[in-house]
């Protein structure tokens, strides 16, 4: 696992986007990027929209979708992606699970097969304050494939800001599993704010345990973590020095 700690919080999105752009430019023959939703990637998508790099050779696959929400629902992740990225960037193909399907488990199997067929070259991730990645909550087996999951109360409360009321936040989601995510060739995880500091410390310096799903990333061969100072605040002094030095070298 490699990591960078950016000097200023506002640089987090640009640095993260530049890492993605390197892959987009490096692979004109075709590239599959796994995309995330929530607050963590918003700045990255804003940088992407402004840059308008040619992505007609890029296929995207999203991590998850709420069960019960149709693609045109204002709070679906289909709509989220359309508003924050897809309406400004022309991709070859873009895929998001269908949350309004009559059989979410069948849709999970279909989506798992699709992801396996495409193969993810680089996966963009955020991290929850409880260490979840995608909607893989604490306790999810490390070998889990795409599945239907029940959302914890803390996750629903964290996502309430995207809805009018807590009661409107769905209780289930279709999500790529931890095992599915780990099959990506590269992983880019972006985290900011003190609210993520404990999860980041556990992910980077704690033991690999399903109590903090993101700790599995310690076992992946190619992970880059981009943090602001607040998210990195609980890391060891040595880890902070390493992350700051990596950022300095990247910016040269």
UniProtKB/Swiss-Prot annotation:
The active site is at residues 64, 130, 132, 137. Pfam families: Glucosamine_iso (PF01182). One of its GO terms (biological process) is glucosamine catabolic process. CDD domains: GlcN6P_deaminase. It catalyses: alpha-D-glucosamine 6-phosphate + H2O = beta-D-fructose 6-phosphate + NH4(+). One of its GO terms (cellular component) is cytoplasm. Disulfide bonds: none annotated. Keywords: Carbohydrate metabolism, Hydrolase. Pathway: Amino-sugar metabolism; N-acetylneuraminate degradation; D-fructose 6-phosphate from N-acetylneuraminate: step 5/5. The keyword Coiled coil does not apply. It comes from the Bacteria. Belongs to the glucosamine/galactosamine-6-phosphate isomerase family. NagB subfamily. Catalyzes the reversible isomerization-deamination of glucosamine 6-phosphate (GlcN6P) to form fructose 6-phosphate (Fru6P) and ammonium ion. This is Glucosamine-6-phosphate deaminase. The lineage of its organism: Bacteria, Bacillati, Bacillota, Bacilli, Bacillales. The gene is nagB.
């Amino acid at each position: 696992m490699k990591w960078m700690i950016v000097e200023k919080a506002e640089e987090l999105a640009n640095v993260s986007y530049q890492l993605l752009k390197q892959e987009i430019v490096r692979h004109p023959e075709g590239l599959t990027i796994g995309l995330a939703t929530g607050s963590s990637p918003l700045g990255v998508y804003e940088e992407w929209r402004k840059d308008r790099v040619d992505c007609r050779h890029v296929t995207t696959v999203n991590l998850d979708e709420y069960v019960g929400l149709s693609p045109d629902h204002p709070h679906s992740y289909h709509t989220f992606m359309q508003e924050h990225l897809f309406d400004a960037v022309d991709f070859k193909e873009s895929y998001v699970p269908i949350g309004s399907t009559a059989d979410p488990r069948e849709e999970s199997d279909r989506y798992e097969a699709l992801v396996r067929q495409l193969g993810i070259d680089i996966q963009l991730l955020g991290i929850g304050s409880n260490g979840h990645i995608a909607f893989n909550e604490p306790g999810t087996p490390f070998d889990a494939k795409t599945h239907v999951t029940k959302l914890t109360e803390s996750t629903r409360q964290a996502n309430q800001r995207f809805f009018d009321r807590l009661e409107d936040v769905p209780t289930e989601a279709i999500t790529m599993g931890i095992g599915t995510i780990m099959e990506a060739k590269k992983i880019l995880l972006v985290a900011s704010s003190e609210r993520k500091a404990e999860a980041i410390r556990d992910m980077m310096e704690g033991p690999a345990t399903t109590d903090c799903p993101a700790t599995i990333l310690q076992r992946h061969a190619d992970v880059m973590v981009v943090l602001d100072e607040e998210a990195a605040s609980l890391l060891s002094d040595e880890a902070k020095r390493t992350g700051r030095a990596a950022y300095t070298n990247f910016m040269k």
